[in-house]
């Protein structure tokens, strides 16, 4: 899975928040699930402007169908008309069709200028089926009528501004990714345009069946791990597998352990600030539980989503360099294993700027997580954890691509120290993890760094069930923007919180994790980078359960201090951020 660093840094560097009084409005990132990405669209009937009756299934022979909401009166729609005309002409040969939908009842669309099918949706049927909210909004359907992208065409035009050319081509990038068999890096944005009131037409509801609804929920939220070759203990890619595991699915979803996401939910009426939020939407959760409690209808196989292809090669493309641990590590069948630490030399005689990185275990099924540190040549890497990691791997998240102008520095002569946590699964095996790097073509404008807010001097008393430890960086001497947060503790970790303190003493919570789970070393990646003014402070607080109420506690009778193994503890609040690079062009 590719992390969306490119999208987050470039596509939304100039957006405004919902609370911003600035009247200018550019596309903003949305959570795909909340935007309806991954949902099945029923086979809605329509009559086009030429008087020809049709259905959405008329486009099933197309690889992709763009459903573009537009009209002839909205200024933004007028500006985007040439782009849509080019789109339907240039992408037709690639198997992409375009359906134009005009939701404005009083509009006179006769001179619209498009060659594709054009529907004047006066009764709001199509508008209701898609839930369109703007005249400039586009939807991309695959051949199974699954929404794969929803949002803006690009960011050239918005409310109160116009650019000479787009900075980010959201729609074209999504189409390119989808035709290449990839999930779009950005699959949902807002679409500034002329606002649409909710359609008075009642949307045609798809029957609650496995093929029409549940299969997509599982595919979108569980498929990355619960598939053949995935890290999960069982697959969920067929009806029979889902039915066979229905009790476990219900239990883990009800408890909030699946899908794995442990940030506190946003306040009512607010949206999650994290681009990789894995929380099930309320509608997905409701439908999943309703189906599990019913006779679990399978439905029509014609309504099934397309099978998802998972890449077997490098997600970052061909690396410029690969580094692999020298010898395979034997992973036993039972019990637990301590962290394995292995260093690999790089031997570069100059600093390297890394624009993309990917960590690839050869036995993913037993790898809990990997942290890679860049340490001085020949060093044992003592204390490296507190300095910040270079790259990371957790199941479902193993690669990171930065956009042009952003990169991490790999100091000359560094060793790459792999810290690998294995979880035996009943079968003995071996692993020989490696990392691939893609180098920037020139010194970047911005350097991406990782640091840790830490307090290594803590002592957790025996039996303490809610021991609090606080670490801080009281004064940050430069301006920065935070990309992601990554709390790290071991099996006694209970909860965590990040706060930013401004010069005037105001404290803002950046992330709260009320139930930390060592089994999932998650990064929390912001949809929009968080500005950190010079002079601000960062506070990281962690709570620990060293009592017998913690079933993962190896020994409640022991006082616990900092240490590298899971029976020790750590207190690390990793922060990924970027700053201007000295001497960059």
Where are these regions (language model features)?
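N-proximal helix/coil linker or "cap" segments that precede and/or mark the start of modular domains
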Residues: 19-43, 185-187, 191-204
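A short beta-strand-turn-helix
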Residues: 44-65, 203-212
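Short active-site neighborhood of thiol/selenol oxidoreductases, capturing the structured segment around
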Residues: 59-78, 175
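Aromatic-flanked redox-active Cys/Sec active sites in thiol-based oxidoreductases
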Residues: 68-74, 103, 218-220, 227
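Structural microenvironment flanking redox-active thiols in thiol-disulfide oxidoreductases
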Residues: 78-113, 119-129
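Thiol/selenol-based redox catalytic cores and closely related redox-interacting motifs
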Residues: 121-197
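His-enriched metal-coordination microenvironments in redox/metal-binding proteins
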Residues: 133, 313-585
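Aromatic- and Gly/Pro-enriched helix-to-coil junctions and flexible linker segments
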Residues: 188-348, 360, 413-419, 424-426
């Amino acid at each position: 899975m590719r992390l969306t660093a490119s999208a987050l840094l470039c596509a939304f560097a100039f957006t405004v928040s919902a609370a911003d009084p600035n009247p200018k409005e550019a596309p903003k990132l949305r959570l795909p699930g909340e935007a309806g990405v991954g949902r099945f669209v029923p086979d809605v009937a329509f009559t086009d402007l030429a008087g020809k009756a049709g259905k959405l299934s008329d486009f099933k022979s197309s690889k992709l169908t763009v459903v573009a909401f537009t009209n002839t009166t909205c200024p933004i729609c007028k500006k985007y008309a040439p782009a849509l005309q080019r789109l339907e002409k240039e992408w037709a040969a690639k198997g992409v069709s375009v359906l134009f939908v005009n939701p404005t009842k009083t509009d006179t669309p006769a001179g619209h200028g498009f060659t594709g099918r054009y529907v004047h949706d006066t009764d709001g049927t199509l508008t209701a089926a898609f839930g369109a909210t703007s005249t400039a909004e586009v939807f991309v359907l695959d051949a199974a009528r699954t929404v794969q992208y929803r949002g803006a065409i690009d960011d050239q035009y918005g409310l109160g501004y116009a650019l000479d050319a787009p900075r980010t081509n959201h729609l074209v990038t999504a189409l390119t990714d989808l035709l290449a068999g990839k999930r779009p890096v950005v699959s949902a944005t807002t679409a500034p345009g002329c606002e649409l009131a909710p359609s008075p037409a009642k949307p045609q509801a798809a029957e609650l069946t496995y093929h029409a609804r549940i299969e997509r929920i599982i595919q979108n939220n569980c498929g990355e791990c619960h598939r053949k070759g995935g890290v999960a203990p069982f697959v969920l890619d067929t009806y029979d597998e889902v039915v066979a595991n229905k009790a476990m699915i219900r239990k883990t979803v009800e408890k909030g352990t699946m899908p794995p996401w442990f940030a506190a939910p946003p306040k009512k009426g607010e949206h999650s600030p994290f681009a990789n939020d894995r929380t099930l939407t309320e509608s997905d959760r409701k439908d999943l539980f309703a189906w599990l409690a019913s006779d679990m209808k399978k439905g029509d196989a014609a309504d099934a989503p397309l099978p998802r292809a998972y890449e077997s090669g490098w997600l970052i493309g061909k690396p410029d360099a690969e580094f692999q641990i020298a010898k395979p590590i034997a992973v036993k069948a039972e019990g637990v294993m301590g962290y394995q630490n292995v260093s690999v030399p790089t031997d570069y005689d100059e600093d390297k700027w890394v624009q993309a990185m990917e960590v690839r275990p050869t036995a993913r099924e037993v790898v809990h997580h990997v942290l890679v540190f860049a340490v001085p040549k020949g060093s044992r890497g003592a204390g490296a954890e507190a300095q910040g990691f270079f790259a990371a791997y957790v199941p479902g998240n193993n690669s990171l691509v930065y956009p042009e102008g952003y990169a991490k520095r790999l100091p000359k002569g560094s060793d790459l120290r792999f810290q690998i946590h294995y979880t035996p699964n009943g079968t003995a095996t071996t692993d020989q993890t490696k990392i691939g790097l893609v180098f920037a073509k020139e010194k970047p404008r911005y350097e991406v760094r990782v640091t840790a807010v830490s307090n290594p001097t803590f002592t957790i008393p025996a039996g303490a069930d809610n021991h609090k430890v606080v670490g801080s960086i009281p004064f940050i001497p430069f301006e920065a923007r935070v990309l992601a947060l990554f709390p790290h503790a071991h099996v006694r970790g209970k909860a965590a919180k990040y706060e930013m303190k401004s010069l005037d003493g105001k404290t803002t919570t950046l992330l709260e994790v009320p139930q930390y789970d060592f089994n999932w070393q998650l990064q929390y990646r912001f949809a929009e980078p968080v500005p950190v003014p010079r002079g601000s402070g960062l506070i990281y607080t962690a709570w620990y359960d060293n009592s017998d109420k913690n079933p993962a506690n190896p020994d409640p009778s022991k006082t616990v201090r900092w240490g590298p193994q899971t029976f020790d503890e750590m207190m690390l609040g990793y922060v990924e951020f970027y700053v201007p690079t000295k001497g960059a062009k």
